[in-house]
């Protein structure tokens, strides 16, 4: 009998769905990847090349969806009727939260390509600005006055990313909810060692956001941890008049 070739689960998922590169770890670790009908949560699980693999890709089940949803509840922020920018949209977890909470339109901004889920691509309320850096936004790309901004900028510090949004027009009373990733804010490339690192990262992010023309209302710890258990935060701001 010929030897069955096996790969690590993460590698096999990416072989079949390369567009999931930015979310594959989250999908596996949160039980959204099924091998022969059973959820597998170890990235290194060996799977046969011909195994049946199913991936649940509903944004409501993504960790990002839960992060923003719970943060908006804690911060008392309403998205009803807003026209929003979701910077760092990726698969669209934050975008889906905004839509579920009544957003009129969401500009989903993502430097990558092919990540936004098909259901969101087909939603007439979503403007898909993939292959677009936040620094490339203009009033021509985003002609509407923006009343809400959500950010999950990956490896770009908020102090650098948020000022780049100033090329668009903001509506009076516009609000911002920015996810703080300590590794990005501190430039360490490592998970924060203790609470002081998280606090320092959040403080730096808040200072950068304030310098970009926002009044910082509140900072909180994210109620949902990031990949590999990373402690993250949120900054809530309101556009200064």
Which residue stretches match the model-derived regions?
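Conserved alpha-helix/loop element of class I SAM-dependent methyltransferases that forms part
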Residues: 63-82
